[in-house]
Amino acid sequence: MKRQKRDRFERAHTQGFKAGLHGRSKDNCPYQTQDDFRSHWLGGWRDAMEARNTGLFR
């Protein structure tokens, strides 16, 4: 059985989360011209910032 491709929106969210954990700026979003993907990336970034502020990650 073939492995399904990942959902591109989920991948954008995950990449945004990783960027947020590493303390990168939201201006470094690789999806500047693609609003749908940018929205998911920023959602992941915001989730990471919230997790950092609550002390879940350093």
UniProtKB/Swiss-Prot annotation:
Gene this chain is encoded by: rmf
Sequence segments annotated as region (Disordered): 1-28
UniProt subcellular location: Cytoplasm
Biological role: During stationary phase, converts 70S ribosomes to an inactive dimeric form (100S ribosomes).
Single Gene Ontology BP annotation: regulation of translation
Family: Belongs to the ribosome modulation factor family.
InterPro entries xrefs: Ribosome_modulation_factor, RMF_sf
Gene3D superfamilies: ribosome modulation factor like domain (1.10.10.620)
GO cellular component: cytoplasm
The protein's name in its UniProt record: Ribosome modulation factor
HAMAP family: RMF (MF_00919)
Organism listed in the record: Idiomarina loihiensis (strain ATCC BAA-735 / DSM 15497 / L2-TR)
Keywords: Cytoplasm, Translation regulation
Source organism superkingdom: Bacteria
